[in-house]
Amino acid sequence: MADALDLAPLLAAGWSHDPERGVLSKTFGFETFVAAFGFMTRVALWAEKWNHHPDWSNSYGTVEVSLTSHDAGGLTERDLKLARKIDELAAA
Protein backbone atom coordinates (compact mmCIF):
# COMPACT_ATOMS: atom_id res chain seq x y z
CA MET A 1 0.00 0.00 0.00
CA ALA A 2 2.46 2.67 1.16
CA ASP A 3 5.11 1.14 -1.09
CA ALA A 4 3.57 2.74 -4.18
CA LEU A 5 2.99 6.11 -2.49
CA ASP A 6 5.51 8.95 -2.62
CA LEU A 7 5.97 9.82 1.04
CA ALA A 8 9.21 11.80 0.57
CA PRO A 9 7.63 15.28 0.34
CA LEU A 10 5.57 14.69 3.48
CA LEU A 11 8.51 13.24 5.39
CA ALA A 12 10.55 16.31 4.39
CA ALA A 13 7.70 18.47 5.74
CA GLY A 14 7.94 16.87 9.18
CA TRP A 15 5.52 13.96 8.95
CA SER A 16 6.61 10.61 10.39
CA HIS A 17 5.78 7.25 8.86
CA ASP A 18 5.27 4.14 10.96
CA PRO A 19 5.21 1.34 8.37
CA GLU A 20 4.27 -1.33 10.90
CA ARG A 21 1.09 0.54 11.88
CA GLY A 22 0.53 2.07 8.43
CA VAL A 23 0.29 5.55 9.94
CA LEU A 24 1.49 9.05 9.07
CA SER A 25 1.77 11.39 12.05
CA LYS A 26 2.79 14.93 12.83
CA THR A 27 2.65 17.29 15.80
CA PHE A 28 1.58 20.89 15.24
CA GLY A 29 2.24 23.69 17.71
CA PHE A 30 0.19 26.87 18.15
CA GLU A 31 0.56 29.82 20.50
CA THR A 32 -2.88 29.44 22.07
CA PHE A 33 -5.61 26.90 22.60
CA VAL A 34 -7.94 29.00 20.44
CA ALA A 35 -5.46 28.89 17.53
CA ALA A 36 -5.09 25.12 17.91
CA PHE A 37 -8.85 24.62 18.08
CA GLY A 38 -9.36 26.87 15.05
CA PHE A 39 -6.88 24.73 13.11
CA MET A 40 -8.72 21.57 14.15
CA THR A 41 -12.02 23.10 13.04
CA ARG A 42 -10.63 23.96 9.60
CA VAL A 43 -9.21 20.44 9.24
CA ALA A 44 -12.51 18.93 10.40
CA LEU A 45 -14.43 20.73 7.65
CA TRP A 46 -12.14 19.30 4.96
CA ALA A 47 -12.10 15.86 6.57
CA GLU A 48 -15.89 15.80 6.57
CA LYS A 49 -16.05 17.05 2.97
CA TRP A 50 -13.67 14.27 1.87
CA ASN A 51 -15.15 11.69 4.27
CA HIS A 52 -11.67 10.89 5.59
CA HIS A 53 -11.04 11.73 9.22
CA PRO A 54 -7.81 12.01 11.23
CA ASP A 55 -7.08 10.43 14.57
CA TRP A 56 -5.90 13.31 16.73
CA SER A 57 -5.51 14.80 20.16
CA ASN A 58 -5.21 18.33 21.48
CA SER A 59 -3.50 19.68 24.57
CA TYR A 60 -3.58 23.47 24.84
CA GLY A 61 -1.53 24.65 21.83
CA THR A 62 -0.45 21.22 20.61
CA VAL A 63 -2.33 19.08 18.10
CA GLU A 64 -1.10 15.56 17.35
CA VAL A 65 -2.44 14.14 14.09
CA SER A 66 -2.32 10.56 12.82
CA LEU A 67 -3.60 9.46 9.45
CA THR A 68 -4.41 5.99 8.14
CA SER A 69 -7.09 4.42 5.99
CA HIS A 70 -8.69 1.98 8.42
CA ASP A 71 -10.79 0.38 5.68
CA ALA A 72 -7.66 -0.34 3.61
CA GLY A 73 -5.50 -1.43 6.53
CA GLY A 74 -2.83 1.24 6.01
CA LEU A 75 -1.90 4.32 4.06
CA THR A 76 -3.62 5.31 0.84
CA GLU A 77 -3.57 8.35 -1.39
CA ARG A 78 -6.45 9.72 0.73
CA ASP A 79 -4.06 10.02 3.68
CA LEU A 80 -1.44 11.85 1.64
CA LYS A 81 -4.06 14.22 0.22
CA LEU A 82 -5.35 15.03 3.71
CA ALA A 83 -1.81 15.43 5.07
CA ARG A 84 -1.02 17.98 2.35
CA LYS A 85 -4.24 19.86 3.13
CA ILE A 86 -3.46 19.79 6.87
CA ASP A 87 -0.03 21.31 6.22
CA GLU A 88 -1.65 23.99 4.05
CA LEU A 89 -4.17 24.82 6.79
CA ALA A 90 -1.49 24.92 9.48
CA ALA A 91 0.50 27.44 7.44
CA ALA A 92 -2.52 29.70 6.82
UniProtKB/Swiss-Prot annotation:
GO biological process: tetrahydrobiopterin biosynthetic process
Keyword match Lyase: yes
CDD domains per UniProt: PCD_DCoH_subfamily_b (cd00914)
InterPro entries named among the record's database cross-references: PCD_sf, Pterin_deHydtase
Recorded superkingdom: Bacteria
Disulfide bonds: none
Catalytic activity: (4aS,6R)-4a-hydroxy-L-erythro-5,6,7,8-tetrahydrobiopterin = (6R)-L-erythro-6,7-dihydrobiopterin + H2O
Residues of the signal peptide: none
Name of the featured protein: Putative pterin-4-alpha-carbinolamine dehydratase
EC number: 4.2.1.96
Keywords, comma-separated and alphabetical: Lyase
The species this protein was found in: Cereibacter sphaeroides (strain ATCC 17023 / DSM 158 / JCM 6121 / CCUG 31486 / LMG 2827 / NBRC 12203 / NCIMB 8253 / ATH 2.4.1.)
